[in-house]
């Protein structure tokens, strides 16, 4: 039997599989070059993965691709960003470049990667009295997929030597109750640095509104779009009733951010609706970092593969080149939700699938009971199930028309309260007339 040609093999493979490996190879080549990873180092890492045979074959391919790409750049006298970092480290370490600066300032330090940390260390060690001044927030470290390694931040002294650690604890974005609740939530991971947050804005009770949404299969986007539109109309109407007072205070439109975990959930296809009194924009959780708005609406804060936290796992081949996942379950997903949660100054609406709310909803209720309110998209209060504390109490009728209140998570939760049918109120005059009538009947 003759072997298949490359073209025949490629034709037999699903396009989705080809696309997947294109992405994996591109990411790995980037990190191989920036971190100067040798084939032997990669093969050693491959032996630590679950599928060692697959990983070793992949190393042979991807390292060859990285070599060919590097050669192509050299032949065309070009340089890419990864070359800049790697070459800079080599030039500093070999003394080809001597920095005239004794103070190295680094912003957004929570996003630091191994190659960039190597460059900072090389610059620091050029002179005995060089200092590193780094500013960052480990609670907002959300870029592991680009090579960010949070341990470089949390283990600063192990990487850069003895240090002084200051605290920037004041926030000018969230109100105090929202800030406290979000801080308690993210610090449930014991590996996060402990901090207190002091807000310049006073606490606003029930700053977090949980809105259960009935979602039909394959119609998630439509369901969340409908609920989001009702909330937006509420906000626009509310501000409209205070338009004169708002304008007198010299304020512009109220700002609202609609946020989602994955871009496929964008309910407006990149074209958010316009209103008279509010300005609406939408983007992903990751892209919202650094932004703020008066209100935010977070979509599909529910359990599921593409939910919050996301259960989509990276291909283990990426562990050849990026930091290993943290031991604490969904550590980066927790930080990502924290980032999305803290974009609002006044309040945040969490739109959840009514039958599979995110585990984070229950946690928020535990750490901030006065911050959370359950309501419909129209603003009506919803009572939570007193048994499971996850579902909501909904009304219905049994086959015999007896009304009841039960948990929305049935049959997972069987809590149910049958409600007695009240008899109509009987007036004293009617009761007296009935007594007289009965007496006459008895006299017959």
Question: Where are the predicted features?
Answer:
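Short cysteine-rich clusters marking metal-coordination/redox-active sites
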Residues: 385-388, 407
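Short metal-binding segments enriched for Cys and/or His
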Residues: 409-436
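Conserved helicase NTPase motor core
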Residues: 51-151, 170, 290
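A basic/glycine-biased coupling hinge at the interface between accessory DNA-binding modules
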Residues: 1-79
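Conserved RecA-like helicase ATPase core segment
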Residues: 114-212, 310
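Helicase P-loop NTPase motor core
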Residues: 162-164, 171-277, 329
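A short beta-strand element within the Helicase C-terminal
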Residues: 281-314
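C-terminal accessory regions
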Residues: 302, 306-378
């Amino acid at each position: 039997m003759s072997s298949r040609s490359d073209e025949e093999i490629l034709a037999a493979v699903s396009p989705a599989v080809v696309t997947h490996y294109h992405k994996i190879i591109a990411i790995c080549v980037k990190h191989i070059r920036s971190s100067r990873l040798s084939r032997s180092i990669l093969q050693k890492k491959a032996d630590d993965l679950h599928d060692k045979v697959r990983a070793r074959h992949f190393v042979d391919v991807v390292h060859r691709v990285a070599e060919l790409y590097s050669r192509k750049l050299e032949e065309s006298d070009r340089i890419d960003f990864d070359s800049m970092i790697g070459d800079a480290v080599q030039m500093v370490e070999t003394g080809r470049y001597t920095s005239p600066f004794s103070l190295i300032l680094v912003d957004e330090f929570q996003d630091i990667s191994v190659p960039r940390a190597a460059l900072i260390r090389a610059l620091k060690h050029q002179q005995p009295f060089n200092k590193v001044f780094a500013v960052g927030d480990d609670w907002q470290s959300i870029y592991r997929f680009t090579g960010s390694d949070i341990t470089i931040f949390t283990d600063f002294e192990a990487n850069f030597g003895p240090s002084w650690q200051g605290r920037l604890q004041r926030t000018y974005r969230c109100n105090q109750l929202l800030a406290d609740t979000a801080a308690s939530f993210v610090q449930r991971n014991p590996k996060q640095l402990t901090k207190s947050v002091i807000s310049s804005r006073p606490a606003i009770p029930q700053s977090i509104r949980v809105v259960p949404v009935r979602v039909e299969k394959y119609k998630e986007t439509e369901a969340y779009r409908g609920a989001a539109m009702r909330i937006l109309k509420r906000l626009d109407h509310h501000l409209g009733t205070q338009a004169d007072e708002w304008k007198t205070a010299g304020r512009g439109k109220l700002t609202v951010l609609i946020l989602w975990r994955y871009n496929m959930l964008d309910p407006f296809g990149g074209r958010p609706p316009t209103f008279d009194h509010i300005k609406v924009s939408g983007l992903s959780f990751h892209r919202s970092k650094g932004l703020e708005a008066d209100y935010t609406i977070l979509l599909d804060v529910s359990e599921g593969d593409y939910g919050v936290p996301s259960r989509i796992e990276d291909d283990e081949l990426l562990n050849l080149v990026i930091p290993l996942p943290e031991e604490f379950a969904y550590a980066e997903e927790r930080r990502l939700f924290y980032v999305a949660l803290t974009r609002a100054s006044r309040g945040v609406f969490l739109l959840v699938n009514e039958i599979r709310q995110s585990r984070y909803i229950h946690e928020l209720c535990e750490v901030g009971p006065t911050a959370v309110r359950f309501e419909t998209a129209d603003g009506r209060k919803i009572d939570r199930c007193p048994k499971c504390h996850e579902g909501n109490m909904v009304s219905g009728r049994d086959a015999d028309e007896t009304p009841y209140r039960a948990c929305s998570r049935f049959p997972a939760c069987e809590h149910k309260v049958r409600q007695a049918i009240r008899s109509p109120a009987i007036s004293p005059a009617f009761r007296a007339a009935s007594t007289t009538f009965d007496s006459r009947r008895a006299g017959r």
